[in-house]
C-alpha cells in the first residue's frame, strides 16, 4: 500500500488543538521550546541539535541519515540511528509531560521525522522572515514609516546569536551565517528608513554598536556617515569615514567602496544629499493613513510615535 501524502488536515498532523498551538519554537538565540511562557527541558546538546535540525526544516521530512550526519558529521557511532530515535522519544516525552499530544508535533514519517508547525506565529524565525519581507516591500515603495514598524518588529524576535547554545555544530554555523546576513540587512534598511523620517539621532547609537561588531560592513558605515551628516555632525561623519578607511587598509588592504568615497567627498563639500535623502522625503511614509503624508509634513509629535526600539 502506498504512503498517504502529507496533508495539514490529516488527523495525525492536525495542529489546531489549543495545547499544540501554544507551543513556541525559538531559534533566534539559544534554542527554546516554550509552552505558555514556560521553557521546556530539551536535554543534551546532541538531543537539542536534533530538534534544531527538524525546526530549521519545519513541516518537511528530515531523513534519519541526514540527522545522523548533522549531529556526528564524519564519525557517527555504529548505533547512531538508534540514538537519534531515542532523542526523538525523549523530546516526545517532554512534550507529553507538558500536556501536549506529541503525535501532533513530532511525527515519524519515512525516511525520518517531521516537525509540524501549523501557525507561523509559533516560530520566531517565521515571524522574523514575514516582518522582514513586509518591511523591505514598504521600503522599496518609499513607505518608510511603515517600513520602520515592520523592520523593528522583525528585530524584536532576536534574543542573541542564532542557536547560540549549539554553535559547535557545523550545520548551525552555516545557517547562522546566512541568517546573520538577513539580520544586518534589516538593521541597514531600518536605519535608512529612520534617517528618511528625520530620526537619524535615534539610530546613530545603534549604528555605532553595529559597526563595532561588523567593522567591514560598509553598508552600515554608509548609514552612520549619512546619519551624522543629516543630523549636522559633519566632523563625526568625516571621522566615521576615516575609521572605516583605516580598518579596511590595515586589515584587508583595500579602500572603501566607490559609493562610500563619493559620500565622503559630498560631506567634505557640504553638498545636499538629495540623491540619498531627498528621494525618500518625496515618498509617502504612512500606508495606514492613506493620505500620502510626506516626511517633511510630519510634526515632531508624529515622529515621536516611531518605534523606540530603534534605539
Curated annotation (Swiss-Prot):
Residues 15-117 bind DNA. The gene is moaR1. It holds the Pfam family BTAD. Induction: Expression of MoaR1 appears to be modulated by oxygen availability since it is up-regulated in both microaerophilic (NRP1) and anaerobic (NRP2) cultures compared with aerobic cultures; thus, seems to be up-regulated during the shift into the persistent state in the human host. Acts as a positive transcriptional regulator of the molybdopterin biosynthesis moa1 locus, promoting the expression of the moaA1B1C1D1 genes. Binds directly to the moaA1 promoter. This is Transcriptional regulatory protein MoaR1. It comes from the Bacteria. One of its GO terms (molecular function) is DNA binding.
Amino acid at each position: 500500500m502506498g504512503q498517504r501524502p502529507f496533508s495539514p488536515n490529516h488527523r495525525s498532523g492536525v495542529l489546531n488543538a489549543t495545547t499544540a498551538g501554544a507551543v513556541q519554537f525559538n531559534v533566534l538565540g539559544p534554542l527554546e521550546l516554550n509552552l505558555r511562557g514556560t521553557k521546556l527541558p530539551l536535554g543534551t546538546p546532541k538531543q537539542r541539535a536534533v530538534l534544531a535540525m527538524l525546526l530549521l526544516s519545519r513541516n518537511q521530512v528530515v531523513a534519519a541519515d541526514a540527522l545522523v550526519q548533522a549531529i556526528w558529521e564524519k564519525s557517527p557511532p555504529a548505533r547512531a540511528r538508534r540514538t537519534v530515535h531515542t532523542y526523538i522519544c525523549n523530546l516526545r516525552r517532554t512534550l507529553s509531560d507538558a500536556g501536549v499530544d506529541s503525535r501532533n508535533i513530532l511525527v515519524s514519517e519515512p525516511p525520518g521525522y517531521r516537525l509540524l508547525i501549523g501557525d507561523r506565529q509559533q516560530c520566531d524565525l517565521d515571524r522574523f522572515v514575514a516582518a522582514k519581507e513586509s518591511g523591505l516591500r514598504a521600503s522599496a515603495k518609499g513607505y518608510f514609516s511603515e517600513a520602520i514598524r515592520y523592520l523593528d518588529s522583525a528585530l524584536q524576535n532576536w534574543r542573541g546569536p542564532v542557536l547560540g547554545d549549539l554553535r559547535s555544530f557545523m550545520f548551525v554555523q552555516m545557517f547562522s551565517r546566512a541568517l546573520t546576513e538577513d539580520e544586518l540587512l534589516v538593521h541597514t534598511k531600518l536605519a535608512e528608513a529612520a534617517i528618511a523620517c528625520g530620526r537619524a539621532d535615534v539610530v546613530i547609537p545603534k549604528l555605532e554598536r553595529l559597526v563595532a561588531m561588523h567593522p567591514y560592513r560598509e553598508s552600515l558605515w554608509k548609514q552612520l556617515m549619512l546619519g551624522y551628516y543629516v543630523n549636522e555632525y559633519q566632523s563625526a561623519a568625516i571621522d566615521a569615514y576615516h575609521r572605516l578607511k583605516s580598518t579596511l587598509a590595515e586589515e584587508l588592504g583595500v579602500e572603501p567602496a566607490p559609493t562610500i568615497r563619493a559620500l565622503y567627498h559630498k560631506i567634505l563639500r557640504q553638498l545636499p544629499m538629495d540623491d540619498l535623502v531627498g528621494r525618500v522625503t518625496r515618498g509617502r511614509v504612512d500606508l495606514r493613513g492613506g493620505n500620502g503624508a510626506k516626511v517633511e509634513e510630519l510634526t515632531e509629535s508624529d515622529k515621536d510615535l516611531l518605534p523606540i526600539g530603534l534605539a
